[in-house]
């Protein structure tokens, strides 16, 4: 068995619509839907935009963590479309959670003081230049921004 190795894929900056759609308390926790308004991504092998075509079905859990469930599209700079889906977790202190309603305050939080991780998967056309993404399991390290969220995404080798 070998150690985990990664390869940097891209950094993505996603803009989320305000206000979020608040469902409220459910048997599973407090549900919110954050709509993707747009964004950009760029890396050594791929770059492009994130059209307004997806969202994050966020669940604030009873244990104080946040479960994320994202589905979105990526459009490469050469016109190809890629579907991405990922789950993940955000874990932060109750004081930090209080900043989530204010984007400027959320961006001011030091990302090293909270845990924000994702596990992206991709679907690309099998006959296209990004078919290699169909075989990638990735991990993302996230941070909160004034416009939404940003991630550095790495392929697991």
Q: Which residue ranges define each predicted feature?
A:
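Beta-strand-enriched cores of mature, soluble protein domains
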Residues: 1-157
């Amino acid at each position: 068995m070998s150690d985990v190795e990664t390869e940097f894929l891209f950094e993505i900056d996603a803009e989320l619509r305000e206000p979020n759609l608040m469902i409220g308390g459910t048997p599973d926790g407090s549900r919110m839907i954050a709509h993707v308004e747009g964004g950009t991504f760029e890396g050594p092998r791929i770059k492009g935009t994130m059209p307004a075509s997806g969202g994050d079905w966020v669940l604030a859990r009873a244990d104080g963590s946040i479960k994320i469930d994202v589905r979105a599209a990526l459009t490469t700079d050469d016109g190809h479309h890629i579907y991405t889906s990922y789950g993940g977790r955000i874990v932060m202190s109750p004081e930090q959670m209080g900043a989530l309603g204010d984007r400027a305050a959320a961006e001011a939080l030091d990302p090293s003081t909270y845990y924000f991780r994702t596990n992206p998967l991709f679907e690309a056309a099998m006959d296209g230049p990004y078919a290699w993404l169909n075989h990638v399991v990735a991990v993302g390290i996230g941070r909160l921004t004034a416009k939404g969220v940003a991630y550095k995404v790495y392929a697991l080798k």
